[in-house]
Amino acid sequence: STLLASSAASDVYKRQSVALIKNGQIVYTGGVGDADQGQHEANNGETMFPLASAEKYLTALVIGHLIAEHKLSFNTKLAKFFPKIDHSKGISIRQLLDHRSGIQMDELTPDQTLTSEQAILDWTFEQMGSTGDHSFIYANANYAVLAGIVRQVTGKSFANVLQQTIITPLQLTHTHNFTALTAQMPVAQGYLTAGDNDYQPDELSNALLSTLLGSGSVYMSAMDLAKVIIAAETGKIMPLKVYHQLINANYGDGNPYASGVMWLDDQRLLQGMYNDNPESFSTLAYFRADAKSGVVLFGNHTMSTDTVSLAQNLEALVN
């Protein structure tokens, strides 16, 4: 109740879902406001939200699992899989994970929804550029390329490998690609405030979602992401030695981003939003090593960009 009161009293979210972690266990889930006002459905810990860039963490875990199985290494070069990409001989898996590959691409929306993983990859390769610059350049295309590598290494679709590596073993019942959503599922509707109307729908573009292979096309509940975090932090997805290598990098430029994790005060931070929908959907997880404590916080009506401070305050309630 303290958690919900703190969340509702904040001016960060009007509508949100939360899961709370303590000592490797989910100790609380809940929600504030409507998941879908038209259907009179309230947010709760099982409400599914679009993950946005928080999905990169899941993709990185799939890569880490393949590394643990010796099917890849952090130093494996892109040229082994996609030799036609410029500078591919000098681009490693590690650099793709950390947006240090030199690949550049804006968040673009195609005219039509892309209907297969191969179509997504083809479109991405047409739109992106590869510069040879290995400074930090954030681009979703890095994770589409990683998904393409997963496809080549395993001979399976990326969706299938994600299912086999994470979703099925962890019994995630509220995690689906946007293409698999049904009217019966508890899915959050995005909202924004327009004048006196707090229930102005803010629709996500399916065409945009279709481009975000490995980086933002999956819907997930706060409870399910908390399960993933706990499993990853306690060695259930890959050995902890590999996991710690996966989420740590030191490039000497002060930017600690590694494999979807944006570090903050030595704690792990996952964060996502959609450029065209900044006032509705946002996803965030803030957690400590070994899942000692943490908060997963998803919003479908975001009133402020200061979501991190709210997550830190909520995490302090259980740490």
Model segments located where?
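A short acidic/small-residue loop/turn micro-motif
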Residues: 33-37, 209, 302-303
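Structural recognition of the beta-strand scaffold that forms the well-ordered cores
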Residues: 17-19, 50-52, 95-97, 294-298
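Short, surface-exposed loop or secondary-structure junction motifs
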Residues: 91-270, 275-277
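Short, small-residue-biased leader/transition segments that mark boundaries at the very start
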Residues: 2-13
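Structured C-terminal helix/loop/strand segments within mature extracytoplasmic catalytic/sensor domains
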Residues: 235-236, 277-319
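A short, well-structured edge-of-sheet supersecondary motif
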Residues: 11-41, 261-263, 295-296
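Active-site-proximal loop and beta-strand segments within enzyme catalytic domains
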Residues: 37-139
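Short aromatic/basic micro-patch
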Residues: 3, 48, 219
